[in-house]
Amino acid sequence: MSEAVGGVYPQVDLSGGSSRFPEMEENVLSYWKKDDTFQASIDQRDGAEDYVFYDGPPFANGLPHYGHLLTGYVKDIVPRYQTMRGYRVPRVFGWDTHGLPAELEAEKQLGIKDKGEIEAMGLAKFNEYCATSVLQYTKEWEEYVTRQARWVDFENGYKTMDLSFMESVIWAFKELYDKGLIYQGFRVLPYSWAEHTPLSNQETRLDDSYKLRQDPTLTVTFPVTGVVEGSSANAGLVGALALAWTTTPWTLPSNLALAVNPAVTYALVEVAEDGEAEFVGKRVLLAKDLVGSYAKELGAEAVIVSEHPGSELVGLTYEPIFGYFRDHANGFQILGAEYVTTEDGTGIVHQAPAFGEDDMNTCNAAGIEPVIPVDIDGKFTGLVPEYQGQLVFDANKDIIKDLKAAGRVVRHQTIEHSYPHSWRSGEPLIYMALPSWFVNVTEIRDRMVEVNQDIEWMPAHIRDGQFGKWLEGARDWNISRSRYWGSPIPAWVSDNDEYPRVDVYGSLDELEADFGVRPKSLHRPDIDELTRPNPDDPTGKSTMRRVTDVLDVWFDSGSMPFAQVHYPFENKEWFDTHAPADFIVEYIGQTRGWFYLLHVLSTALFDRPAFKKVVAHGIVLGDDGLKMSKSKGNYPNVNEVFDRDGSDAMRWFLMSSPILRGGNLIVTEKGIREGVRQAQLPMWNAYSFLQLYTSKNATWSVDSTDVLDRYILAKLHDLVAETQAALDGTDIAKACDLVRNFCDALTNWYVRRSRDRFWAGDEAHPEAFNTLYTVLETLTRVAAPLLPMTTEVIWRGLTGERSVHLTDFPSAESFPADADLVRTMDEIRGVCSAASSVRKAHKLRNRLPLPGLTVALPDSARLADFASIIRDEVNVKNVDLTSDVDSVGTFEVVVNAKVAGPRLGKDVQRVIKAVKAGNYTREGDVVVADGIELNEGEFTERLVAANPDSTAQIDGVDGLVVLDMEVTEELEAEGWAADAIRGLQDARKNSGFEVSDRISVVVSVPEDKKEWITTHADHIAAEVLATSFEIVTDALDGETHDIVAGVTAKVTKN
């Protein structure tokens, strides 16, 4: 037992006297705010090279969630680290303010149900409301982000609805238009009838866009009636019934053609007596490969009358399934289309060109114009009077009923399939031909693929996998939205088709030059009010009017890198020299969202990537492994976690997980609390230990010759070097692993093995105090980005200086490297851990000494100088070292047939025989048996030892330990005395004594333990600082303390 001194540390106390991390964090946040530490971290790097980081702007009309929390931590760690590495890292917050998310929230708050109500209210009032409601939760966001200890500039943040931002957006539009990369077209697009607007293809690939939905499927007949004049179709097929299958019966009233694959073989089949009664004896046409799929309807005895290549069907005409468009030019014929397959259906595809992209392309080639009997509400128009006013999905029931009555239905089923829904309203989409403006992405697709090779992706496989494949299949981007609140499409067109003209504007100056007024707003309705006479109309009667659509909100998001700095109107040189960004991060779904559209616009506008490095993290899941849901309550409340465990605990839990390597993460309270134990507590405990025993200021020193000091300093060298490499590579999870492992070595080995030196005091062993101070001062700088508030408390407590976040990241060169010592000492730790596992398995307490430990390790002689450490740590009397590992035990490979079998097939038995015969080799995680490779998981290892119960493997090396567990009475007595010391220490503590107080002890023991305590009395007294130690066998009067079983004691302060 030693005297505690203390009083030197903390130099500055940010703990407020509390040992609870959440309370310390509140003190740190208050200090940072008062001190303006964040701004100081920027200012001190004035003149340094900028590190450019793009912060994907969130919407402020909803509260933040765990996804924002996770991404926010990464967005804080990387800039903090890069600042410590000498860069200037401005961090400006931005707000996404336009588009459907904003409009739908405003509609919800206003009780608006459709666009008519918006127009009745007036665009100006509606958009004014959107501008306010979209920032509804900015205060909550600021509080949330600040509580995260995330440093970001809110005061100078940008909003996508700012005039400066929007001017840069219309500049981008005009640039693309002038490059021929924007065009107006009529295409089949995903259309949200609930929100009255088309969507882009990538929006239908966002999370939650595809949902399971039950829909009817129909196989219907199309009677062949003739041959198109001049075609080579087989006239012998007239009278047959062509069968077509559809999952969208509501499109059948718009049918204008059928499509077959000219290279596929089709069969003319006569329906047998046991087939569908209504069609018995009739001849039907379908792909030969799919005849078996219709065995029930065609009958078991159905006969294939003849076979025909699809080319013989091209040019046949047929009876329309409905009569609405009977006279439509070039309609109701069978066309050839290579996209038709025999994977499902009948091999004959019904064509409704207004509602299918392939249908439109096929019909356009045949001169068949689409018909669109559906309005903006997704309801049938008067073109199909029987179903007028019905939502198309609701009309399915009546359409099927009418077709059955007409004898046209061969099969009617219901399927459950994944179907696209609006990412905002959740209603099912329809695909419908609409006029729209497009970015010609296909024109730059190959270049986008090339430019992607210059980006460093984490995880790396995304570059050529999920993102690369998406780029290879990229399609033109529909950027029109038939809505109100957004950046305008800056195109003005003539209102008279006889005098066509299109003007596109890319700046306020250009608008002012043509319209004679400088816009104060680019929002509707202000921008719509700018009109002028058409210069190309000699009559002067036509007017140039802006197209009413606004831009896809993702166009805003993709413009963020340059629009946030009002490029090219301001900051042109800065942006041109600071793009691409050094780093961005969002969740993996943004490979089809923000990451993708940043890439599209940067490639199109600047012929370069938008970012150099990107982290695409996984998804945060609830504690049941499912998506987080408020109604299910399957995740811990964020604020409760902050109040109970602190933000640093949450940060550590999220950042140390596989989620930053692309995996998903289940959030549990237990996992968060485990994070506290991995790094925060060890760090704090080591700091508290230094506080407790220091009597004078320690100094920063790496000169100690003590082996434990040399070891921890060498470990510190490795920690600094490896953590720097990890964070340079943005491998935050690895950095956390490194810090966690170092903290384990620091507290569970270095501090514990050095206790005697610390107890002796800093006069006797200044090198121990200086080393621990140096280690803690350096460790807090290394871990500062990972645990910003915990490290701030400790670092300021140690140094008294302004902030750990204003320091430089340590240099590994400042510390002595000693790879051999680290390797040897880590092996010793492994030896002790293995021995401890055997002891624990046999329920032998640590204070009970045991006879000996055998350590079998290749080249074990190098551990000889450290045998005393092993002996003391494991609490054994003798340590025997041997290099003959096989004499102690071996590991046999056992084939896991269930895992290996599916891959190896019949060879698995051959492998099992070879392994049993010892005919195998092993290198790392791979075993080769009889020439066949077994991968990790396809085999296990089994220890074969002379004394398996007392033998354990040394983790990380090819070695074993054998613990001699034979306990003699002498050893039992010694262990009992150690237990008594512990009991008396507890009695001191419970009595409220100071660590340095001297005491008197009267101890009552059973007669059978009197000899044991008498033998060890001097040792016990010395350990508990007892100047008087009396042994009795009678019961004690007054207040006593239970020491060990059957033993009580009275302790009094001298």
Curated annotation (Swiss-Prot):
It comes from the Bacteria. Its cofactor is Zn(2+). Pfam families: Anticodon_1, DUF5915, tRNA-synt_1. Its EC number is 6.1.1.5. It catalyses: tRNA(Ile) + L-isoleucine + ATP = L-isoleucyl-tRNA(Ile) + AMP + diphosphate. Keywords: Aminoacyl-tRNA synthetase, ATP-binding, Cytoplasm, Ligase, Metal-binding, Nucleotide-binding, Protein biosynthesis, Zinc. One of its GO terms (biological process) is isoleucyl-tRNA aminoacylation. The keyword Iron does not apply. PROSITE patterns: AA_TRNA_LIGASE_I. Its main location: cytoplasm. ATP binds at K630. It is found in: Cytoplasm. The keyword DNA-binding does not apply. One of its GO terms (cellular component) is cytoplasm. CDD domains: Anticodon_Ia_Ile_ABEc (cd07961), IleRS_core (cd00818). Residues 522-543 are annotated as: Disordered. One of its GO terms (molecular function) is isoleucine-tRNA ligase activity. InterPro entries: aa-tRNA-synth_I_CS (IPR001412), aa-tRNA-synth_Ia (IPR002300), Anticodon_Ile_ABEc (IPR033709), Ile-tRNA-ligase (IPR002301), Ile-tRNA-ligase_type2 (IPR023586), M/V/L/I-tRNA-synth_anticd-bd (IPR013155), Rossmann-like_a/b/a_fold (IPR014729), tRNAsynth_Ia_anticodon-bd (IPR009080). A motif ('HIGH' region) lies at residues 58-68. Residues 523-539 have a biased composition (Basic and acidic residues). IleRS has two distinct active sites: one for aminoacylation and one for editing. The misactivated valine is translocated from the active site to the editing site, which sterically excludes the correctly activated isoleucine. The single editing site contains two valyl binding pockets, one specific for each substrate (Val-AMP or Val-tRNA(Ile)). Monomer. HAMAP family: Ile_tRNA_synth_type2. Catalyzes the attachment of isoleucine to tRNA(Ile). As IleRS can inadvertently accommodate and process structurally similar amino acids such as valine, to avoid such errors it has two additional distinct tRNA(Ile)-dependent editing activities. One activity is designated as 'pretransfer' editing and involves the hydrolysis of activated Val-AMP. The other activity is designated 'posttransfer' editing and involves deacylation of mischarged Val-tRNA(Ile). Belongs to the class-I aminoacyl-tRNA synthetase family. IleS type 2 subfamily. This is Isoleucine--tRNA ligase. It comes from Corynebacterium glutamicum (strain ATCC 13032 / DSM 20300 / JCM 1318 / BCRC 11384 / CCUG 27702 / LMG 3730 / NBRC 12168 / NCIMB 10025 / NRRL B-2784 / 534). The lineage of its organism: Bacteria, Bacillati, Actinomycetota, Actinomycetes, Mycobacteriales. The gene is ileS.
